[in-house]
Amino acid sequence: MALDILAMAPLYQAPAINRIGPKTDPSKRPADPLKPLVLSRTKLTTIEAKRIMSILDEAIYKVELVTLLSYVASNREDMEGMLGEDVMRAVREHEDLCQVLLENVRCLKEKERQLQEQKEAEEEGWLRDRLLSIELQKSSLSPLMQQIKDSTKNVLRLLLSNPQAARLLQMQTQGRSAEAQNFIDSLIELRGFLFEKLLTSPMEARDKAQFLQDISRQNSNNQQIIDTLEKELAERMKNRNAEVEKENFVIQELKNHLHQVLKFSENSLVRTKQEAEKQQKADFRASQARVAKIQQEILQLQSQFYNLVMENREAEQALRKKKYKVETEIENWIQKYDTEMGEKQEELEDLDAVHREEKISLEELRRRHKVLVGEFAQIREEREINSKKRMEAEQEMVRMVRAATLIQALWKGYLVRSLLRSKKKRGKGKAKDKEKGKQKGKEKGKGKK
């Protein structure tokens, strides 16, 4: 609606705009006229606004589910596995009640149609009895409609307690009628209007009001221009009236002729009036009978109202007892919860104390571990030094053994060489003697030959 007003605003400002020259400075252009209606926020900030929107969203969600109940009833085999037995049982009961209501309404319309057809031919007493039976049947529709309302609430309660089934049902949008979809679209549109209203801050509302006042002021200026134009029109109308007066003379002659025609029609009007009076008397008698019947119905409705009040009082007492019982159980559960939470808190404190002690002991063990690591590193360094010294000593011992062995070998070699040298000297003398003997033997052999 606000956008429509803004769309019409330039039409009201047309006379003033036409007076402005075509050349304007771009740097001096006015601000955006729609700026006061642009919302500065996109999200709700107050709890009350969020609650209002959540209530409306919940209502739309329930309407979406209720409008699909007829589709569920007509596709029971396909939907039974998706929604469950409890929901399908409630839907079948709801469908049975709706069928009973539709059958009663159809029968009631049929009786009213028959009564309308036979109203002129039958007697007045018989008509009263038929009308009384129809009214009684109409009064019996109210409890049935209440049962249908309760059944609808029961189906919604079961669907809301089973979110998965509700989501599956909500996806079956092809089963919704066009009228139901239009109703849901209207609710969604209402939600958009309400959301925009809740997003509007008091400052924005004042700006919008100021903006509308400016538009109203511009409208008043335009109205002054219109008044001026109307004055010009009035002057021209005076000139036109002079011409009209000339034509009025011709019209007056036609009226005289019409007056004569009306005189002839007065007789027929009198006859029609007499017939209307007769019909009025007949209608008055019928209305008296109808008033008596309505008074009887009022007495019956008053007795039904008293009975319903008594029944509702008994139901209210039962609900009050049930409410007191539920509140007592809730208090017991709260006390039990507080006791258990106290025990859990004590246990948590004990565990926290044990945790702190374990943490302190862990720090002590870490400190000792650092000391032991330092001692271990020192011992390992000492062992490495000792092993190096031992290896050096062993290597020195090996060198000494090798040197002693070498010295012994050299000494033994020297002794052997010296011994061999002495033996060679003695052997040379013996060899010379042997050679001399061999030569002599050879010479003797040659001489024998």
Curated annotation (Swiss-Prot):
<comment type="subunit">
    <text>Component of the nexin-dynein regulatory complex (N-DRC). Interacts with CFAP52.</text>
</comment>
<dbReference type="GO" id="GO:0036064">
    <property type="term" value="C:ciliary basal body"/>
</dbReference>
<comment type="function">
    <text>Component of the nexin-dynein regulatory complex (N-DRC), a key regulator of ciliary/flagellar motility which maintains the alignment and integrity of the distal axoneme and regulates microtubule sliding in motile axonemes.</text>
</comment>
<feature type="coiled-coil region">
    <location>
        <begin position="90"/>
        <end position="125"/>
    </location>
</feature>
<keyword id="KW-0282">Flagellum</keyword>
<keyword id="KW-0206">Cytoskeleton</keyword>
<keyword id="KW-0969">Cilium</keyword>
<feature type="domain" description="IQ">
    <location>
        <begin position="400"/>
        <end position="429"/>
    </location>
</feature>
<feature type="compositionally biased region" description="Basic and acidic residues">
    <location>
        <begin position="430"/>
        <end position="449"/>
    </location>
</feature>
<dbReference type="Pfam" id="PF00612">
    <property type="entry name" value="IQ"/>
</dbReference>
<feature type="region of interest" description="Disordered">
    <location>
        <begin position="422"/>
        <end position="449"/>
    </location>
</feature>
<dbReference type="GO" id="GO:0031514">
    <property type="term" value="C:motile cilium"/>
</dbReference>
<protein>
    <recommendedName>
        <fullName>Dynein regulatory complex protein 10</fullName>
    </recommendedName>
</protein>
<dbReference type="GO" id="GO:0005737">
    <property type="term" value="C:cytoplasm"/>
</dbReference>
<keyword id="KW-0963">Cytoplasm</keyword>
<dbReference type="InterPro" id="IPR042815">
    <property type="entry name" value="DRC10"/>
</dbReference>
<keyword id="KW-0966">Cell projection</keyword>
<dbReference type="InterPro" id="IPR000048">
    <property type="entry name" value="IQ_motif_EF-hand-BS"/>
</dbReference>
<keyword id="KW-0175">Coiled coil</keyword>
<comment type="similarity">
    <text>Belongs to the DRC10 family.</text>
</comment>
